[in-house]
Amino acid sequence: MMEESGIETTPPSTPPPSTIGTSVPAATTAISTPVPPIFSSPLAAPVFSPLPSFAQPIFSTPLPSSVPPLRTSVPLTYAPPLPVTGVHSPPAHTSVPAAFSSPLPAFSSPPSFPPPPLNTTPGPVLTAPPTGPPVGGFSMSSHYDITKGHAGRAPQTPLMPTYSAAPVTVLPNPVIQAPLAGSGSSITFPEEPEDSRVHTMHVDGSAGGIWGFFKGVAGNPMVKSVLDKTKHSMETVITTLDPGMASYIRTGGEMDIVVTSVKEVKVAAVREAFQEVFGMAVVTGEDGQSNIAPQPVGYAAGLKGAQERIDSLRRSGMIHEKQPAVSVENFIAELLPDKWFDIGCVIIDDPTHGIRLETFTQATPVPLEYVQQAQNLTPQDYNLRWSGLSVTVGEVLERSLAHVCRTDWHVAFTGMSRRQMIYSAAKALAGMYKQRLPPRIL
């Protein structure tokens, strides 16, 4: 394959860097000491002579067949290639003699550079390239087979650079770092200085426990306002879906009212009015006696009958003498000549706070003939004739008109029920009563 003139007939492909500048005796396969990339030994391989114009070989590309083969700077004789193995054996000598006893012939010219020092340390073992991205410089390593790469043979794999990551130096953080207890991670986080104000607030908040926390939140005016609005909204939804739930939801609190009647038309109207004004109120009914005529005539008789109902309950012990009570009494009055009206008197009596208030419902017109019938049905010697009639206007209307109830005939004449009339008056009464109560009661 080689001629005596030293002309190379092998393909002009660049051998791997492991063969560049390597001077090995017959028993030595590798040199572990790193050498310069261009000229590393006085002995050059017979198959390659690096060009002096390149500072460092970066890539090796096979030359086309049209390019003439490279010549070595010194005529060399052919030497059989040394087998390349993955295991490096220690060199036989620690210094380079002037002449070798190996079959390789000596150069006829002196070397241009001094020989590199050799040591006895085994060379590094070739490792696979790292999986990470290139960080530092790179080095090329490969195995080269001279039997391949000819025309018609197996193609030669071009040399690819393999990268090695340079060691990264981690500078210490000047911020104080707190060690992580019970964790195997090396990540540390800066420790922030504690705020004494936050610590004081935490201690003060935890001094009262969970109840102290709720007490503090409930005492906040803004929180209380939000809670009240939320509660009112929920009550509105519930009472809209089921109006009968209003009395159960709003029953409670310090406001306790007794109505001097067991009729639902009166008790329900007063309860709804006071719960609307005070939010929470307990309203119950007791049957009180008016001790006047069943159909009072005139304002004085109506007011007398309402007050007598309260007094009768207190005399009988049905309610406490200091118990606030509300009484409703309907009467008729001739406000204009031959014009009669039905009116309801609503009063509240609170002996504890010395409050006594009166109001009246709207006036409902009553036809004159029905009032005259009630007067004719009342005996002349009726003992309570001074206060009114023995027959009510409702009884007369019930006898005279179909589908009319004696207790709620107002809706047939006005389209507005008696309960609505009492509710309107009772709500106005509750508003006046609330204004006169001491603030601690509210």
From Swiss-Prot:
GO terms of molecular function: protein kinase A regulatory subunit binding
Family under the similarity heading: Belongs to the PRRC1 family.
Matches recorded under Pfam families: NTPase_I-T (PF01931)
Annotated stretches, region: Disordered: 1-27
Superkingdom field: Eukaryota
GO biological process assignments: epithelial structure maintenance
Keyword Protein biosynthesis: no
Subcellular location(s) per record: Golgi apparatus
Species per Swiss-Prot/TrEMBL record: Xenopus laevis
Keyword line: Golgi apparatus
Keyword Transmembrane attributed: no
GO CC annotation, single: Golgi apparatus
Gene symbol of the encoding locus: prrc1-a
Protein name: Protein PRRC1-A
